[in-house]
Amino acid sequence: MKHLFKFSLCALALTMGANTGFAQSGETGLKDAYKDYFSIGVAVNMRNISNPEQIAIIKKDFNSITAENDMKPQPTEPAYGQFNWENADKIANFCRSNGIKLRGHCLMWHAQIGEWMYKDEKGDLVSKEKLFQNMKHHITAIVERYKDVIYAWDVVNEAISDGGWQGGRRGMGEHPSPYRNSPLY
């Protein structure tokens, strides 16, 4: 499904570019060709903003960036109160220095979240109140840190399974239903 969406989006962009002549000229990037209509975004990671060829493409064609994984809960706070801002800061600074909008992705996602968020020191699930307290702690820290550069946040990503996964992830066990397989639900 994700590959189909990406393919469709690329096909749409190429088709629109072909209809206006911009894709063939090599002079006008997508972001400039459609600046009066909508933003053109791309998901990036550290490899993308460290590669000169990819940097050139990003600067030419895109005016909005989404951090692919580097702003998710696990990479930014692997343990309670132990933050690792290195990659997220680099992406934010890249956007600041190049005048590119940044979309935060994402504040909560069951697949990339530290167990500290939903389990106690004995490995038992925490209460709903403690879970909400942990979530608030994490969300407040990251939103405050990037409030000057992030224009929008994806708050919750894939809160429940869409049917493509039936258990087997660390800490989640097996579930007969494709729904309710997140420790956050």
Protein language model annotation of sequence segments:
Residues C10-A13, D32, I55, V143:
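Generic marker of residues within folded, mature protein domains
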Residues G81-Q82:
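Residue-level marker of alpha-helix boundaries and capping positions
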